[in-house]
């Protein structure tokens, strides 16, 4: 039984090591057989019980040796340094998949695939995202630095717009697809260049996507 109700409504930017289409979005295997990803999110409105989460940001860095569903992954979470102690605890419970119906959110699903969760990092997060424009910037000094851009037509150079519609998903219902570059430091190190990126509006609660 879930004792605490929560909800977050905001925008995300995700960059992983797959090619532009990311087979994982279609229950395929990752492009290179393993997964590396960084996700940033800003909560426009949110709460965990009576604790307000409006305006806070967080970042999650992931690494799996194979496909996500095969497990053995590790993660590092960065929480907005502006959050109070109570807000930090609330965000970590949500991000770590607690207080959630099993399998209902990406946080809960991903948590079930991890064998190592590094100590949380509390730091300033520079995060800007334009979902419709497929533009993003995500910087946590010493931890991660990345950006997102539209895919370009190889012949004309014009922006190429593609979306993924996932009505029964556990993260988003509609995502704009682009490309991204990321370099991470800290406990999980890797570099991505011109790989899959998604930009989406997120509205989740303890029971999954809010529709």
Q: What are these model-derived regions, one by one?
A:
Residues 2-48:
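N-terminal ordered "arm"
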Residues 21-23, 44-48, 82, 132, ...:
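Generic structural motif
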Residues 28, 49-51, 87, 148, ...:
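Short acidic, gly/pro-rich beta-turn/loop elements at beta-sheet edges
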Residues 33-104:
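Aromatic- and glycine-enriched beta-alpha-beta binding-site module
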């Amino acid at each position: 039984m879930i004792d605490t109700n929560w909800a977050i409504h905001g925008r995300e930017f995700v960059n992983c090591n797959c090619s532009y289409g990311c087979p994982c979005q279609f229950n395929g295997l990752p492009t290179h057989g393993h997964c590396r990803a960084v996700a940033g999110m800003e909560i426009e409105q949110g709460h965990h019980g009576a604790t307000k989460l409006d305006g806070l940001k967080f970042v999650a860095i992931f690494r799996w040796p194979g496909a996500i569903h095969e497990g053995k992954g590790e993660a590092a979470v960065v929480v907005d340094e502006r959050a109070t102690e109570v807000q930090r605890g609330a965000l970590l419970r949500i991000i770590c998949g607690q207080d959630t119906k099993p399998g209902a959110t990406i946080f809960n699903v991903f948590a079930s695939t991890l064998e190592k969760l590094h100590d949380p990092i509390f730091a300033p997060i520079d995060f800007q995202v334009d979902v419709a424009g497929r533009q993003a910037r995500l910087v946590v000094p010493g931890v991660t630095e990345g950006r997102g851009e539209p895919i370009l037509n190889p012949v004309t150079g014009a922006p190429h717009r593609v979306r993924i519609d996932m009505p029964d998903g556990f993260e988003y219902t509609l995502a704009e697809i682009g490309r991204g570059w990321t370099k991470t430091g800290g406990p999980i190190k890797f570099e991505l260049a011109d790989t899959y990126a998604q930009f989406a509006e997120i509205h989740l609660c303890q029971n999954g996507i809010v529709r």
